[in-house]
Design a protein with these regions (language model features):
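Short, conserved charged micro-motifs
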Residues: 36, 285-291, 320-323
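PLP-dependent enzyme catalytic core of the Aspartate aminotransferase-like
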Residues: 155, 295-296, 305-331
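Active-site phosphate-binding strand-loop segment of PLP-dependent enzymes
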Residues: 124-176
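N-terminal "arm"/small-domain region of PLP-dependent enzymes with the aminotransferase-like
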Residues: 1-50, 65, 135, 164
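Conserved PLP-binding catalytic core of the aspartate aminotransferase-like
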Residues: 256, 268-296, 315
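Conserved beta-loop-alpha segment that forms the PLP phosphate-binding cup at the N-terminus of a helix
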Residues: 56-57, 71-95, 209
Length: 331
């Protein structure tokens, strides 16, 4: 057995019950895609007895057009979790050190720990100080950050510390494109950027992600990649979403407007603005609010293990967020 697994703490899923009567605002999924796009995807699902195209050329061509990055610097995966997994596996050896600003997306900890590596959590304000003292092999950042929603420019650090690799998880970049370094990553010897179709694109169910990096690291990733991991549905849906990004952008714009409305409604509360599709609310009665919302069929995420008395709320419809704001105001 891999002895490193003795140190792995399993990722704890939220208490989610699948039901059409529930409103899910706990996992930061994006808004549903338009019906016309769903129909086009269904119409193209005609060949499921063969493996999907392992080259994924049509999908990569669409990503090249969307991102402006040559497809030779892009690879696709079964979700960005898989992309992150491959990135860590390529870069890390046992006993290497990884620095992660805290709080952050915790799913990556399983991969890092299973490889026998050490993790240092630090505040984002002391990141450079910890790079100097801890000398990590890898720094992982989610930009915008999950769950705080702040953005961070990684490139100055990548230039200043060429001996450290920087993995930047841009899962929420569609909600604040100015923060993205996706079109710059391939120019650096020590930068990998991952993205997903789960958030801004509203396609969490298909599990589709992608990454970009320089040709040297990309060749290492491709040397161990399972090129059949992107299924036919995911490849088709990804292409259709990219072809009609105008509709996706409309959903994103609406989400950002709803978020502003929600924050304005709760301006007297300790609520963190965010460059993603969620906000973090701090309240001494957070657990009571979470339970009342749950009793009404609305799920939000308790984040008190990161910051005491906090909940993370994914943006839903305007009506959803108005209802939630009115409930919070009772406390």
């Amino acid at each position: 057995m891999n002895v490193n697994l003795d140190n792995v703490k399993p990722y704890i899923l939220s208490d989610r019950v699948i039901s059409s009567d529930m409103t899910y605002l706990d996992w930061n999924e994006g808004s549903a895609i338009p019906d016309k796009m769903m129909k086009r995807i269904k119409d193209k699902l005609t060949d499921l007895h063969h493996y999907s195209d392992p080259s994924n050329n049509e999908l990569k061509d669409a990503l090249e057009a969307h991102t402006g990055v040559d497809k030779t610097f892009i690879e696709v995966f079964n979700g960005s979790d898989s992309a992150l997994d491959y990135a860590f596996r390529v870069l890390l050896n046992s006993n290497d050190k990884v620095c992660i600003p805290y709080p952050n997306y915790t799913q990556v900890n399983q991969t890092i720990t299973s490889l026998g590596c050490r993790v240092l959590n630090c505040d984002i304000s002391t990141l450079e100080e910890n790079i100097k003292s801890f000398k990590p092999k890898v720094v992982y950042l989610s930009v915008p950050n999950n769950p705080l929603g702040y953005v961070y420019n990684t490139l100055p650090l990548a230039e200043k510390y060429p001996g450290t690799f920087f993995i930047v998880d841009e899962a929420y970049a569609e909600f604040f494109p100015k923060c993205s370094i996706f079109d710059q990553a391939y120019k650096y010897a020590n930068v990998i950027v991952t993205r997903t179709f789960s958030k801004g694109f509203g396609l969490a169910g298909i599990r589709l992600g992608y990454l970009t990096t320089n040709s040297y690291i990309m060749n290492k990733i491709r040397s161990i990649n399972n090129f059949k991991q992107v299924n036919t549905l995911a490849a088709i849906a990804g292409v259709e979403a990219l072809k009609d990004f105008k509709s996706i952008q409309s959903n994103i714009n609406l989400t950002n407007r709803v978020k502003k409305m929600f924050i304005d409604m709760l301006k007297d509360y300790r609520i963190r603005d965010s460059h993603a599709n969620f906000v973090l609310l701090e309240h001494t009665r957070a657990k009571e609010i979470i339970e009342e919302l749950k009793s009404l069929g609305i799920l939000v995420r308790d984040r008190s293990k990161f910051i005491n008395n906090t909940m993370r709320i994914t943006m839903g419809s305007g009506a959803d967020m108005h209802q939630i704001a009115e409930i919070i105001k009772k406390y």
